[in-house]
């Protein structure tokens, strides 16, 4: 094989892989992308607050059973136009929600509790009303590119007086 042929093959393979990388962004919610972080994470007690329109939030426990830190960097769902990871912080003596821009870090052996009044996943631009008894799929995306779909039941919730109309 000549040097030119090897270079041409390597360039072709690189172009194909680059094209596939661009396609990987739109994974179906029912498929898990294998990877170290997604493989070591278990979600339990997941639920999303019922809402007629606008915004709502998803909650639950995310346990890292892996040997390294798992970092949730995003989420997707066909139920909403966009999802954001939110954390609650104290600013000027008052608690406020803000986007968790560096994601949710979950050390090995630890559990992240997503709860009203604390860290949660915001679903913005609901595409249809979410009514108690329904289930939606939310796919968690990790910093290593792996993903994990979660079936999330919709529940009525009036506690904590959360307002997601923002």
From Swiss-Prot:
Keywords: Cell membrane, Lipoprotein, Membrane, Palmitate, Signal. It is a lipid-anchor. A lipid is attached at residue 23 (N-palmitoyl cysteine). Gene3D superfamilies: PCu(A)C copper chaperone. Its main location: membrane. Residues 1-22 form the signal peptide. GO terms for cellular component: plasma membrane. It is found in: Cell membrane. A lipid is attached at residue 23 (S-diacylglycerol cysteine). This is Putative lipoprotein Lxx21020.
